[in-house]
């Protein structure tokens, strides 16, 4: 796998977390992107803090929409959570998978750490596999 696009609804939490963790583990060996189906106005600050606790950085991330060309060309599209819907173009080259990750909203830092650890485990398995 040379490239991956992580997607969630807002691109302010889960997909940014996954991208930051993937960058931490893969450094420059994999091209890493994140996007949202309905981009938020900003990053979820609990996500930023929880990712920093494990040595990754998403503080400079900016929520953005899915780039259709990127969707067509990446090797893997990973949807985080059950709410985001992605229509893959017929010409898409990569595989699509969904990770059922719990929603952290309004649950506080303890819940965010659980979500972070779920994402962390899945990212490591993805990069190893």
From Swiss-Prot:
Q: What induces it?
A: By arsenite.
Q: Known EC number(s)?
A: 2.8.4.2
What the entry lists under SMART domains is as follows: LMWPc
Molecular function per GO: mycothiol-arsenate ligase activity
Q: Which InterPro entries match?
A: Ptyr_pPase (IPR023485), Ptyr_pPase_sf (IPR036196)
- Please give the catalytic activity noted in the UniProt record: mycothiol + arsenate = arseno-mycothiol + H2O
Task: State the superkingdom.
Answer: Bacteria
Mention any Pfam family matching this sequence.
LMWPc
* Presence of the UniProt keyword Transmembrane in the record: no
Query: Looking at the UniProt record for this protein, which Gene Ontology cellular component terms does it annotate, in alphabetical order?
Result: cytoplasm
Keywords in alphabetical order:
Arsenical resistance, Cytoplasm, Transferase
Main location per UniProt?
cytoplasm
Biological process (GO), any one: response to arsenic-containing substance
- According to its UniProt record, where is this protein located? Cytoplasm
Family recorded in the similarity comment: Belongs to the low molecular weight phosphotyrosine protein phosphatase family.
Role description: Involved in defense against toxic arsenate. Involved in the mycothiol/myoredoxin redox pathway which uses a mycothioltransferase mechanism; facilitates adduct formation between arsenate and mycothiol.
Report the protein name in the record.
Arsenate-mycothiol transferase ArsC2
Q: What is the lineage of its organism?
A: Bacteria, Bacillati, Actinomycetota, Actinomycetes, Mycobacteriales
